[in-house]
Amino acid sequence: MKYLSIISIVALALAGDSPISTDSKGKAPLVARFKKTSKSDIEGTIKFEPANNGTVLVSVDLTGLPSGVGPYPYHVHEKPVPESKNCTATGMHFNPFNGSTTAKTPAALELGDLSGRHGNITSESFEVEYDDSYISLNKDSKAYIGGLSIVVHSNNNTRLNCANITTLDEGDDTASAATWSNSSSSSSSSSKNSTNGSSGSSTSASQGSGAGRAEISGFLAAGIAGVVAALI
């Protein structure tokens, strides 16, 4: 029991808020292109464009979602869609700041949890546009999403379809011709509606304060690691 408690404390210390990202102004837009497959009718795009304030304007335009299995969460995943076109191989949610799947604030959620911050897809044909203050189009940023992927899930976290996030001029034959996977998301993220998190642009935290909290978490984790070593 003592060691379980220590592990829990360490996990809390390592968790941190994602900093506000305002470094995308003037950067190249990105897009995830979804195409129909033999097992999925989902098609359309999710576009990422630099906003005037340096955050990212996200435009979702998808059709063909299967009836009866919504609402549909969607997330940025940590790996691209491979040549095998298997959505399971995209790994877990993109989470460079050790966010949580159950957090109550946008900054504390996993960075890739777009639907957690802005709401699930709620219909078989769906369009929405919003500003996200945490992901980045800057290749030098820890929050950069280029080269990763997006997975659309059913309400039980089955991976329905996936697409690579590429620049507008990149080919994406491998990126979006993804196969159906009956396995649930490896990160076991629960479905969330729009009341679970507001738009990233409404968060009042600053980039500096986010970075400060991350640094403090690092110091705390190091101290706890020392305590663990002394107890073992």
UniProtKB/Swiss-Prot annotation:
Cofactor: Cu cation; Zn(2+)
PTM description: The GPI-anchor is attached to the protein in the endoplasmic reticulum and serves to target the protein to the cell surface. There, the glucosamine-inositol phospholipid moiety is cleaved off and the GPI-modified mannoprotein is covalently attached via its lipidless GPI glycan remnant to the 1,6-beta-glucan of the outer cell wall layer.
Positions bound to Zn(2+): H93, D113
Catalysed conversion reaction: 2 superoxide + 2 H(+) = H2O2 + O2
Bias (Low complexity): 174-208
Gene Ontology cellular component list: cell surface; extracellular region; fungal-type cell wall; hyphal cell wall; side of membrane; yeast-form cell wall
Record's signal peptide: 1-15
Membrane-crossing segments per the record: none
Enzyme Commission code(s) on record: 1.15.1.1
Induction remarks: Induced by farnesol and ciclopirox. Expression is higher in opaque cells compared to white cells.
Lipidated residue numbers (GPI-anchor amidated serine): S209
Binding residues annotated for substrate, in chain numbering: R213
Membrane topology: Lipid-anchor; GPI-anchor
Keywords: Antioxidant, Cell wall, Copper, Glycoprotein, GPI-anchor, Lipoprotein, Membrane, Metal-binding, Oxidoreductase, Secreted, Signal, Virulence, Zinc
Sample GO molecular function, one term: superoxide dismutase activity
Gene3D superfamilies in the record: Superoxide dismutase, copper/zinc binding domain (2.60.40.200)
Compartments reported by the entry: Secreted, Cell wall; Membrane
Annotated glycosylation sites: N53, N86, N98, N120, N156, N164, N182, N193, N196
Membership in a protein family: Belongs to the Cu-Zn superoxide dismutase family.
Main function: Superoxide dismutases serve to convert damaging superoxide radicals, a key form of ROS, to less damaging hydrogen peroxide that can be converted into water by catalase action. Degrades host-derived reactive oxygen species to escape innate immune surveillance. Involved in the occurrence of miconazole-tolerant persisters in biofilms. Persisters are cells that survive high doses of an antimicrobial agent.
UniProt-recorded name of the protein: Cell surface superoxide dismutase [Cu-Zn] 4
Organism this protein belongs to: Candida albicans (strain SC5314 / ATCC MYA-2876) (Yeast)
Designated gene of the protein: SOD4
